[in-house]
């Protein structure tokens, strides 16, 4: 009996089984640290649950990202080593075939520029890069650099002295030229002067050779000289020139022997040299009159045709009448008696010279 009474729990021990804390039954209450909890668990709870429960009051530090500089295709990049200087070096390797290979040459030229722009500015497409290069090419810095490149390609105007230094203070001495050269060389100089490339608006030649590509493909437009009927002023000037050549008195040159026959007269000298005589002058005047009459009649016919297009028969009859009148007015070539007298004088002079011998 004594052992059973000792094993029964006491009443106060049963009452202490349920804790007296009112927050025990509160589901939203934060857990409290029990006294039997280990120190490591207490420290972990402090690290995981800062003050305030949610960590809103803490200051968040955000590291700023380094900004990469934006690369632009401007005049500075064009003047760099990968810009136009590299393009000038690569231009020596470009070979074009010329006429008959226009398509392949154009494709080769486009690929040449595309590879250069891909190395210079790979970020942009080919057409966009070309637009950027064109925009940057209008800057003052690019104009100055272009002028310097062109001046570098020009030959030096001053020749170096014996010491190896160029004479800057004195102008270059021009080479003496003969006053008379052969006609074939005159023609060649005229052709060379007409085919020389003209300078651009800034007074400098083109950096890439001007119209060399146009001459290679024979597509350079050439100015065509207008071919039309000569004006009345030209005809009058031609007639006046022929008359003045006849009216000029020709000097009579004496023979070497003094009293012998005179040398050829001015008229004979002109005839020997191919100068126009009276017959040639008459022919020129007749041709000019025919041309003037035909030109005037054609102009009148055009005006008449514009005003009254139904008078074709009248125009034909008028044209026939004008042609007959011109044929009647044309002077016949007259043989002067001067030729006979001059030949007679020549014979007498020859006989006189024979008598002197």
From Swiss-Prot:
Name the UniProt record assigns to this protein: Chromosome segregation in meiosis protein 3
Region (Disordered): 1-58, 255-357
GO biological process: DNA repair; DNA replication checkpoint signaling; meiotic cell cycle; replication fork arrest; replication fork processing
Entry's localization field: Nucleus
Species per Swiss-Prot/TrEMBL record: Pyricularia oryzae (strain 70-15 / ATCC MYA-4617 / FGSC 8958) (Rice blast fungus)
Assembly, per entry: Component of the fork protection complex (FPC) consisting of TOF1 and CSM3.
Transmembrane segments: none
S-S pairs: none
Predominant localisation class: nucleus
Stretches with biased composition (Polar residues): 30-39, 267-276
Record-linked InterPro entries: Csm3, TIPIN/Csm3/Swi3
Acidic residues composition bias: residue spans: 344-357
Gene name of this polypeptide: CSM3
Record-level GO cellular component terms: replication fork protection complex
Pfam families membership: Swi3
Biological role: Forms a fork protection complex (FPC) with TOF1 and which is required for chromosome segregation during meiosis and DNA damage repair. FPC coordinates leading and lagging strand synthesis and moves with the replication fork. FPC stabilizes replication forks in a configuration that is recognized by replication checkpoint sensors.
Stated family: Belongs to the CSM3 family.
Keywords noted in UniProt: Cell cycle, DNA damage, DNA repair, DNA replication inhibitor, Meiosis, Nucleus
Superkingdom per UniProt: Eukaryota
One function term, GO molecular function aspect: DNA binding
């Amino acid at each position: 009996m004594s052992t059973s009474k000792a094993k029964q729990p006491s009443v106060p021990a049963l009452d202490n089984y349920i804790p007296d804390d009112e927050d025990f039954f509160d589901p939203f209450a934060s857990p409290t640290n029990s006294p039997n909890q280990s120190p490591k668990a207490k420290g972990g709870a402090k690290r995981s649950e800062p003050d305030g429960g949610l960590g809103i009051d803490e200051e968040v530090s955000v590291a700023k990202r380094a900004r990469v500089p934006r690369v632009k295709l401007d005049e500075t990049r064009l003047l760099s080593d990968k810009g136009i200087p590299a393009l000038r070096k690569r231009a020596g390797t470009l070979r074009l075939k010329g006429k008959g290979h226009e398509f392949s040459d154009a494709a080769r030229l486009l690929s040449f520029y595309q590879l250069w722009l891909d190395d210079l500015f790979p970020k942009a497409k080919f057409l966009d890069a070309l637009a950027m290069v064109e925009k940057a090419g209008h800057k003052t810095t690019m104009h100055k650099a272009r002028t310097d490149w062109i001046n570098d390609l020009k030959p030096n105007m001053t020749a170096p002295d014996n010491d190896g230094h160029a004479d800057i203070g004195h102008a270059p001495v021009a080479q003496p030229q003969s006053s008379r050269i052969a006609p074939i060389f005159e023609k060649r100089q005229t052709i060379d002067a007409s085919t020389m490339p003209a300078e651009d608006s800034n007074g400098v030649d083109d950096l890439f050779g001007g119209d060399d590509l146009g001459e290679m493909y024979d597509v350079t437009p050439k100015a065509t000289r207008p071919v039309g009927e000569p004006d009345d002023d030209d005809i009058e000037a031609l007639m006046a020139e022929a008359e003045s050549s006849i009216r000029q008195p020709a000097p009579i040159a004496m023979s070497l022997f003094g009293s012998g026959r005179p040398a050829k007269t001015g008229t004979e000298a002109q005839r020997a040299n191919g100068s126009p005589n009276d017959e040639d002058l008459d022919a020129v005047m007749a041709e000019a009159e025919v041309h003037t009459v035909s030109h005037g009649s054609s102009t009148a016919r055009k005006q008449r045709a514009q005003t009254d297009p139904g008078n074709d028969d009248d125009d034909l009859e008028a044209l026939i009448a004008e042609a007959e009148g011109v044929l009647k007015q044309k002077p016949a070539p007259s043989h002067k008696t001067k030729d006979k007298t001059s030949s007679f004088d020549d014979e007498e002079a020859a006989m006189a010279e024979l008598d002197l011998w």
